Every structure is written in C-alpha cells, then in structure tokens.
Amino acid sequence: AGSAFQSLGRIGFVLRNRGYLVLLVIFSLMVMPVMSFLSTSSFIYMNLFNLSAEKYSYFFAFNGCFAMLAPILYMRVLRKLPRLLFLTVCFGCVAVSGSLILIFGAANPFVFALLYVPVTFFGSACRPAGTMLIMNQMDTDNGTVGSLWGCVALLFGSLSMMLCSLNWPVLTMAVGTISLCAGTSCVIIWLVAVSRKMFK
C-alpha cells in the first residue's frame, strides 16, 4: 500500500510541473486526429465511398507511408528548423487540413486521402520534438513522466474515438472537426506557453 501511495505521490509531483503539464496536454491533443482516423477510416472508405476491403487497404497503406516518413525526415532535415517555427507549423497544418476535410473530405476517397496526409505527416513529425521537450521538463522521475504521457495520450485518443461514435451526418466531418479543434487548440496553447516561458 505504501508503495502504491508513493507512486501516486510521484505522479502528483510530476503534474505540479507547469511546463510538463502544458506540454502533456498539447502533445496528447495531437493524438486525437490520428485516433479519429483509425476508428473511422474503414467506415469512411468502405461504407461512404463504397470501396472493397482490398482498395481500402491501399488507401490505409498510403496514409501509413507518411506516418513512417515524417520521423525520418525530422531526424535528417526538419530538426534543423527553429523549434518554435517547426511546431507552430505542425499544429497549424493539422488545423488547416482539418478544416479542408470538414468542407471537402466527403467528395471522393482520393480527396479525403490527400487532405488527411498533412494530419498524418505533421502529427508524426512533431512527436520526436515533443518527446524531447516533455522529457526535458523533469530531471528525475523519468519513468513517471513517460508513463503518464502514454496514459494521458491514450485517454485523449479514447475520447476522440468516442466522439467519432456520435451521430455525425458524415464521418469525414468527425475526422475534420477533431483535427481542426485539436490543431487549433495546440497552436493557441503552444504560443501562449512560449510567450509566458512556461517550459524549458
């Protein structure tokens, strides 16, 4: 029992770090657009666009290629950009892509796939920088820091999937709305946090 209470105490200690808490919220929000796509993509491609399972798998693989490409490009090229500019662009592009999906996403499968690419690419590209920022906020309790981020990100992702289960007129609207709201929220919180120097 003592060990459990001590663990909870360490979680409370970590969450009292304002910089960590702000970054935790920002980068957990970025999980939501990805999880909204994962939970709805089969319904969008197969039910809305009437594609076969095989054709759906091609579109899904196309999207997955950008998820793999983004971290590679970050390590080789994108990390040389100023962090403030890079992350602001990432969050902003997710928001813009979300708004375009909201308006044009239901047109056809190719339009939806292309409009979702920035969400996948920039959502994945910002993750290495986010991991570094989050881990740098604490000199101790690295296990708690990493575990808490994984847990909160999972909760945000679950919330996204739950929101997608609501009665949307078209499921592309769910993906677009969540991407727009998450990206916009990240831009606002990020710029406020930077201006107030909330983190290291």
What role is predicted for each listed range?
Residues 1-24:
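Juxtamembrane intracellular "pre-TM" segments in multi-pass secondary transporters
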Residues 70-83:
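Helix-to-loop junctions at the C-terminal end of transmembrane segments
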Residues 39-54:
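Short amphipathic helix-loop junctions that connect adjacent transmembrane helices
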Residues 177-200:
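Multi-pass alpha-helical transporter architecture, strongest
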Residues 16-36, 117-118:
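Pair of pore-lining "gating" transmembrane helices in MFS-fold secondary transporters
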Residues 121, 133-170, 178-179:
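A late C-terminal transmembrane helix in Major Facilitator Superfamily
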Residues 53-61, 146-147:
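Small-residue hotspots at the loop-to-helix junctions and early N-terminal turns
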Residues 84-130:
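C-terminal transmembrane helical hairpin of 12-TM major facilitator-type secondary transporters
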